Amino acid sequence: MARRSWLMILVINSTLGSLGCATTPYKYSRFHVEASSPEERQTVQFEYGKPHRGLDRAAWIVALPSRILPFHPKVNSHNLSQETAEKLEHYLEANDLTDVLVRVNQYDPVGEWQRMRENSRIAFGWKYTFGTANWLGYTLIPSRVFGGDYYNPYSNSLSVSSDVPAILITEAAYAKDIHSQALPGTYASINQFPVLTLWRYTRAVNDSLGYARHQDDWELERETCATVFPMLGIQAALGGHTATGLVMVLPSITVPIAMIGGAVAGHTVGQTVIAKREHEIESRKSTRIPLNSSEAETDDSESKTQLVGFTESPPDEKPKGRP
């Protein structure tokens, strides 16, 4: 038991210790050839589940525990505000992820299966093994009731249950990570294994922080530290397992203790990073240095933003309203 506790502490420290330290220029992604005219540009699709009083009430009750440890009342609220939708849409558009379907409080197993079949990015073998397992989880334990915000790389869809921009952009960052891989099916499947899955969470959180800093969006950066860090701490404490899965192999009291410990560790790290960044921001304000600490020093011939992919012009950096 003592050995397991030390291993858990080591995993938590190594995972959380790598966050909040981004210093390289933020890289916007480019995965498609740029449209020749604004009319040809693909826009982000949002699909919404239909209201159901009884189902929505049950979902709200089931989600109560999940709102406690991340210290945010809008986690698994099964609602998406216009402001949050616009922030998510801007991230997806800025990183050329307009092919990602956003499902807001929606349950559509038939549609998910069809999208998985049509997803040419993922190899056949991965789609009908790991992809099918993911589809079964979506079908039998629907986020429409049990909550959860997650990107499914096999169907290329993002399921949304929370009204928290930091959480949604972190999951969207995983979509960016998947799109940038030469072997996305292999990468996605490997990252489903316990412990290994922490790697993709860490990369996504760091991308979210880098994006927030480049956009000079202190509210988003602060929310990432305050809300996503505790959630990542829980993941690290569970070793990347789900709480349900661990209950089957560990004493039932061990799982909640691990979750609380991970959340407290994540909260502590998050508040430490917030305090450090607030000090930096105040110092920069007094000396008129840009808030974005990750901005590279460039000359007239260089762009301040690094891009991944085809185009050379950085995407629009001002949030756009949804049509």
Predicted regions mapped to residue ranges:
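Active-site recognition of the HExxH zinc-binding catalytic motif
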Residues: D163-L183
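Auxiliary, metal-adjacent structural segments of Zn-dependent hydrolase domains
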Residues: T24-P153
